[in-house]
């Protein structure tokens, strides 16, 4: 810390009853000291303030000039104490610093000390003021934070094991093994493993490479082909007296057709849907895939349908046919239904006549036998 003798300035000694106080200011930029910094001198003394009120001191601060040098120094005189205002202070601290009501603000000059002569028992305080410009400049002149050192990355080759000690900034993703390659399964192997089916033999492999790598068919179609072996040979039973048809085996359907053909004498006319070779009759398995309906036909499809199966066949084919064929098949079914009704009526009349003629023939034979020959006496007369 510097002393007053370092400046080689002959400041006067303190008068009796006074004390010399010296303030040493830190060195700053000369331009900043002249334009942006100021010093406030605050003389005062400690007083007992039991009531907790704030007080001020009367007195004055006088600036004097050292003759022959031109340097300034300040002389302070303190008077009586008075209450500044009625706001309360800290009551626990009864003895407080009471400042002079006059606190002069002087220029900031770090080249010279500030010399102040105060009465004995007094205390000198000061405050340094600055404006926003100097504050901004001091912020700009602050040294920047040192840059962090770059982490040292260890080069890792393919297949190298992860070291036991990793660097602090190293990422764990740098030590990943990349020499593992899993063999991929083909589509056929995946399908075979999912369905638990044995591997394909060479004769069952497709000839085309495109078909060999194609996706397998849907599981629903596979289940229908293998889970319903007896559905191919089922046909629709014809309607009898308004009852809906039920499914029967193909052999029983063929026997029923032969019986109906032997009992009927009139020829049958078939619709365009039934007679056309391009559209085979649909059975109860019409919802199967189209390939199965072409490749696997029921043995009864080669036989020509009779009258008794016309309505059932038309109803079955009407589900999957277009609108035009459906309307034509509907008109044909109505015509055949009317013919069937006429046929049934004639057969009923025939049987009724046969039943009604049987007692007449019996009575006629009895009358004929009575006229031609004499009857034997019953009583024996």
Swiss-Prot record:
The segments labelled Disordered in the record are 232-381
Q: Name one GO molecular function term.
A: serine-type endopeptidase inhibitor activity
Tell me where on the tree of life, at the top rank, the source sits: Eukaryota
For this protein, the record's InterPro entries field holds: Ecotin_C, Ecotin_sf, Prot_inh_ecotin
Q: Which SUPFAM superfamilies match?
A: Ecotin, trypsin inhibitor (SSF49772)
* Gene Ontology biological process terms from the UniProt entry: symbiont-mediated suppression of host complement activation
Which stretches are tagged as biased composition: Polar residues?
273-292, 363-372
Residue ranges with Basic and acidic residues bias = 336-347
* Sequence similarity: Belongs to the protease inhibitor I11 (ecotin) family.
What is the protein name for this chain?
Ecotin-like protein 3
């Amino acid at each position: 810390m510097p002393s007053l003798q370092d400046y080689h300035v002959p400041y006067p000694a303190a008068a009796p009853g006074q004390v010399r106080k010296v303030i040493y200011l830190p060195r700053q930029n000369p331009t900043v000291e002249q334009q942006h910094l100021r010093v406030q001198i605050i003389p005062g003394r400690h007083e007992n303030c039991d009531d907790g009120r704030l007080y001020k001191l009367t007195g004055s601060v006088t600036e004097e000039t050292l003759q022959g040098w031109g340097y300034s120094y300040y002389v302070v005189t303190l008077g009586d104490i008075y209450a500044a205002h009625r706001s309360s202070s800290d009551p626990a601290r009864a003895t407080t610093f009471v400042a002079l009501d006059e606190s002069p603000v002087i220029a900031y000059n770090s080249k010279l000390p500030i010399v102040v002569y105060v009465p004995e028992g007094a205390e000198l305080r000061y405050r340094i003021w600055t404006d926003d410009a100097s504050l901004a400049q001091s912020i700009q002149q602050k040294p920047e934070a040192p840059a962090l050192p770059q982490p040292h990355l260890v080069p890792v080759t393919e297949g190298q094991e992860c070291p036991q000690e990793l660097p602090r900034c190293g990422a764990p993703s740098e030590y990943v093994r990349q020499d593992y390659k899993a063999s991929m399964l083909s589509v056929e192997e995946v399908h075979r493993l999912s369905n638990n089916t044995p591997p394909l033999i060479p004769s069952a492999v497709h000839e085309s490479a495109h078909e060999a790598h194609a996706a397998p068919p849907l599981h629903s179609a596979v289940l229908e082909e293998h889970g319903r072996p007896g559905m191919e040979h089922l046909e629709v039973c014809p309607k009898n007296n308004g009852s809906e048809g039920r499914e029967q085996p193909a052999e029983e359907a063929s026997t029923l057709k032969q019986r109906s053909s032997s009992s009927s004498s009139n020829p049958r006319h078939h619709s365009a849907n039934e007679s056309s070779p391009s559209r085979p009759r649909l059975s109860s398995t019409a919802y199967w895939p189209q390939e199965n309906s072409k490749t696997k036909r029921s043995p009864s499809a080669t036989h020509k349908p009779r009258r008794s199966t016309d309505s059932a066949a038309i109803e079955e084919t009407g589900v999957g046919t277009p609108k035009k064929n459906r309307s034509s098949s509907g008109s044909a079914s109505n015509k055949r239904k009317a013919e069937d009704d006429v046929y049934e009526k004639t057969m009923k009349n025939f049987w009724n006549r046969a039943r009604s003629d049987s007692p007449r023939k019996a009575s006629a034979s009895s009358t004929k036998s009575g006229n031609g020959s004499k009857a034997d006496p019953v009583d024996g007369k």
